[in-house]
Amino acid sequence: MEPEPQPEPVTLLVKSPNQRHRDLELSGDRSWSVSRLKAHLSRVYPERPRPEDQRLIYSGKLLLDHQCLQDLLPKQEKRHVLHLVCNVKNPSKMPETSTKGAESTEQPDNSNQTQHPGDSSSDGLRQREVLRNLSPSGWENISRPEAVQQTFQGLGPGFSGYTTYGWLQLSWFQQIYARQYYMQYLAATAASGTFVPTPSAQEIPVVSTPAPAPIHNQFPAENQPANQNAAAQAVVNPGANQNLRMNAQGGPLVEEDDEINRDWLDWTYSAATFSVFLSILYFYSSLSRFLMVMGATVVMYLHHVGWFPFRQRPVQNFPDDGGPRDAANQDPNNNLQGGMDPEMEDPNRLPPDREVLDPEHTSPSFMSTAWLVFKTFFASLLPEGPPALAN
């Protein structure tokens, strides 16, 4: 006869997915089959599930009844975790009694509703009275479904004891909804401009003084256009900056000194670029060309700084805006008292902005053109830093 195999004890930890019961730890043998393990669980598990209703899962795999534990469980581990999934057809006694009590309470409520149809409108009042008259122990038990079922089983047939939310949560939801609706109402009222704040108890009455009567013809009509134009110019352009220039990329730029807005990184970049230019010019050119380019560069830099202003830029005489002055001298009644318009008197006279310019300004000389070409060529060789943006 073959000797019987020695039992190999193994520890199994059975877990329930729905967490209705605590984890069950039991001792078994590796020689057991899955069907024998299910039979053992039907005796020791709290709900006594039948073997046909049990499903055992290990490492994500469903265990079949004919399989053996020694073929499924590794030998290196002494403790293994199994998940038990079962369909309990006989629930505990407590839910049965609670459902029976709920059904028994619903029947008289239905009869009362048919006899007294006016009672349905007072269900909300009865709910509030029950919530208001709850004892501290009742508030503590409100988190348990059994206590909620026993407390609110007489409220009416339309309220079930097995609701998704508890009664306390439903009351909170109602308060949150009312508060949100009230805040939306206040926001809409404030946006429309019809919101009137409630007067406070410490409000002091103030007697408003009547405004003085306006003086008739206080401001003459002949001074009104000039004063209005001057005020409009002061408002539109208060303290205009003379160094302001327009930027094609958007926004104004201010003509400021480059040395103020340049940091050490800009100076390092300029020095590196200039050193590379000098090295290329020195190694790939002769000494005479190098000195000539250096001299021209120094002269260009001094001219750019302002030491050698070769040609002064002519001052542009902008035509004077005679609008306010003409408006001040104009008769408010538009009477022809000041004579006719000069343009009407002399039709051959050209306006000031269309006068013929000086021939010296219209046709540039040959020297100015040559100097402009020379300046543009050498200015393109010099590195130019980024423009300073206005804050």
UniProtKB/Swiss-Prot annotation:
Molecular function per GO: transmembrane transporter binding; ubiquitin-like ligase-substrate adaptor activity
Cystine pairs: none
Signal peptide: none
Region annotation Disordered: where it falls in the sequence: 90-126, 317-361
Sequence ranges on the Lumenal membrane side: 285-289
Membrane topology classification: Multi-pass membrane protein
Keywords annotated in UniProt: Acetylation, Endoplasmic reticulum, Membrane, Phosphoprotein, Transmembrane, Transmembrane helix, Unfolded protein response
Biased composition (Basic and acidic residues): 346-361
N-acetylmethionine PTM sites in chain numbering: 1
Residue span of region Interaction with UBQLN1: 115-200
Subcellular location(s) of the protein: Endoplasmic reticulum membrane
Keyword Transmembrane helix attached: yes
A biological-process GO annotation: ubiquitin-dependent protein catabolic process
CDD domains named in the record: Ubl_HERP1 (cd17118)
Ranges facing Cytoplasmic side: 1-263, 311-391
Domain Ubiquitin-like: 10-72
Oligomeric form and interacting partners: Interacts with PSEN1 and PSEN2. Interacts with UBXN6. Interacts with UBQLN1, UBQLN2 and UBQLN4. Component of the HRD1 complex, which comprises at least SYNV1/HRD1, FAM8A1, HERPUD1/HERP, OS9, SEL1L and UBE2J1. FAM8A1 binding to SYNV1 may promote recruitment of HERPUD1 to the HRD1 complex.
Protein name per the record: Homocysteine-responsive endoplasmic reticulum-resident ubiquitin-like domain member 1 protein
